[in-house]
């Protein structure tokens, strides 16, 4: 399971063209894709 951190999620979401909406259960929540 990937470690959940705001910076990691923000980068992952940005790479996918999305915005970070936080994280839950170790997974990034991306919105606006």
UniProtKB/Swiss-Prot annotation:
Entry domain remark: Has the structural arrangement of an alpha-helix connected to antiparallel beta-sheets by disulfide bonds (CS-alpha/beta).
Family designation: Belongs to the short scorpion toxin superfamily. Potassium channel inhibitor family. Alpha-KTx 24 subfamily.
BP-aspect Gene Ontology terms: negative regulation of voltage-gated potassium channel activity
Molecular function per GO: potassium channel regulator activity; toxin activity
Descriptive protein name: Potassium channel toxin alpha-KTx 24.1
Additional remarks: Negative results: does not inhibit voltage-gated potassium channels Shab, Kv1.2/KCNA1 and Kv1.4/KCNA4.
Highest rank taxon of the organism: Eukaryota
Keywords: Disulfide bond, Ion channel impairing toxin, Potassium channel impairing toxin, Secreted, Toxin, Voltage-gated potassium channel impairing toxin
GO cellular component: extracellular region
UniProt tissue specificity: Expressed by the venom gland.
Disulfide partners: 4-23, 9-28, 13-30, 18-33
Post-translational modification remark: Contains 4 disulfide bonds.
Keyword Disulfide bond: yes
Compartments reported by the entry: Secreted
Role played: Reversibly blocks voltage-gated potassium channels Kv1.2/KCNA2, Kv1.3/KCNA3 and, weakly, Shaker B.
């Amino acid at each position: 399971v990937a470690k959940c951190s705001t910076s990691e999620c923000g980068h992952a979401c940005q790479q996918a063209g999305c915005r970070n909406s936080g994280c839950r259960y170790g997974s990034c929540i991306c919105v606006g894709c």
